[in-house]
Amino acid sequence: MSSDRKVLSFEEVSKHNKTKDCWLIISGKVYDVTPFMDDHPGGDEVLLSSTGKDATNDFEDVGHSDTARDMMDKYFIGEIDSSSVPATRTYVAPQQPAYNQDKTPEFIIKILQFLVPILILGLALVVRHYTKKD
């Protein structure tokens, strides 16, 4: 790592989001991973999808090896100005209504309203067929 620590704004880092110019923010540090794009085992799409945001969770979720973590040092270019990083939004799953057993009889009634007339019609056709005089 370089001794003069450069502090970069989130806006500046987020501009570098292309295959030939790719910077990532991981654990408050900025890495220029452009030279590593072709060599990344997950492909360049994985790296590109982590641009323009704090990629710490993306990086940690994969479970990188110690070797991979050591490799990061050569791509380090500075630190992120934490005040310029937008607050992360936590995902809140939509609430699903609880299963209501009272609706099950309604479903059965709807099925019966459909099937009973068909059965009556079928029975009428069978009776007519067998009682018809030749």
Swiss-Prot record:
PANTHER family: CYTOCHROME B5, CYTOCHROME B5 ISOFORM E
Family: Belongs to the cytochrome b5 family.
Positions of the Cytochrome b5 heme-binding domain: 5-81
Encoding gene (name): CYTB5-E
Transmembrane segments: 107-127
GO molecular function: heme binding; metal ion binding
Binding-site residues, heme: 40, 64
Cell compartments where the protein resides: Cell membrane; Endoplasmic reticulum membrane
Function: Membrane bound hemoprotein which function as an electron carrier for several membrane bound oxygenases, including fatty acid desaturases.
The protein's name in its UniProt record: Cytochrome b5 isoform E
GO cellular component: chloroplast thylakoid membrane; endoplasmic reticulum; endoplasmic reticulum membrane; membrane; plant-type vacuole; plasma membrane; plastid
Subunit annotation: Interacts with CER1, BI-1, FAH1 and FAH2. Interacts with AKR2A.
Topology term for the membrane: Single-pass membrane protein
Pfam families, per database record: Cyt-b5
UniProt cross-references to Gene3D superfamilies, sorted A to Z: Cytochrome b5-like heme/steroid binding domain
Keyword Hydrolase: no
Source organism: Arabidopsis thaliana
InterPro entries: Cyt_B5-like_heme/steroid-bd, Cyt_B5-like_heme/steroid_sf, Cyt_B5_heme-BS, Cytochrome_b5
Residue window of motif AKR2A-binding sequence (ABS) required for endoplasmic reticulum membrane targeting: 128-134
Tissue: Expressed in roots, stems, leaves, flowers and siliques.
Keywords: Cell membrane, Electron transport, Endoplasmic reticulum, Heme, Iron, Membrane, Metal-binding, Transmembrane, Transmembrane helix, Transport
